[in-house]
Amino acid sequence: PHGTTTVITDPHEIANVMGTDGIDYMFQATEGLPIDVRFMLPSCVPATPMDESGANLDYRAIDSFYDYPRVQGLAEMMNSYGVIHNDPEVVSKIVAAQAHHKKIDGHAPDLQGNDLNAYIAAGVYSDHECSDIEDALAKLRRGQFIMIREGTAARNLEALAPLLCGKYIERCMFCTDDKLSL
């Protein structure tokens, strides 16, 4: 095979509309494909408490999905405020992922200082929201992995390329994050 052999997806958009039925659909639709499709479970459905969506997924709604062999962990924890301030629902989602020995991806643009320390100490493993080298280095020095993003809207490879020549190269990876297929 040539090209992409594996993708890791976060079905939060379909979950916002269809709830767990949407996640089930994604699993069924990707079964047996000639590409390995893995999943991170959506951490924020709806994305914010003010959003009106087709579903509200608490930690109980996603917990049973951790038993699926293609589930890698909890997708981009966008509610950094909830992590830092110990929101019970956010903490429950993190604890559930950890209980299943799964990774927790981050989403914390420009988080700094003690807030960043608390976010990472909660178990958030990686981040794909670094737009400059200083933000990436702050997270790397605290133990996070950095996903260097080249998506349709956000492109950070040029700004973060120096990381690929330094001592943190083994803690860096690439991601697309919302890439249009055209």
What role is predicted for each listed range?
Residues 10-11, 174-181:
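Short beta-alpha connecting loops at secondary-structure transitions
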Residues 2-103:
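Divalent-metal coordination cores built from histidine and acidic residues
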Residues 43-45, 152-153, 178-180:
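Glycine-rich beta-alpha junction loops
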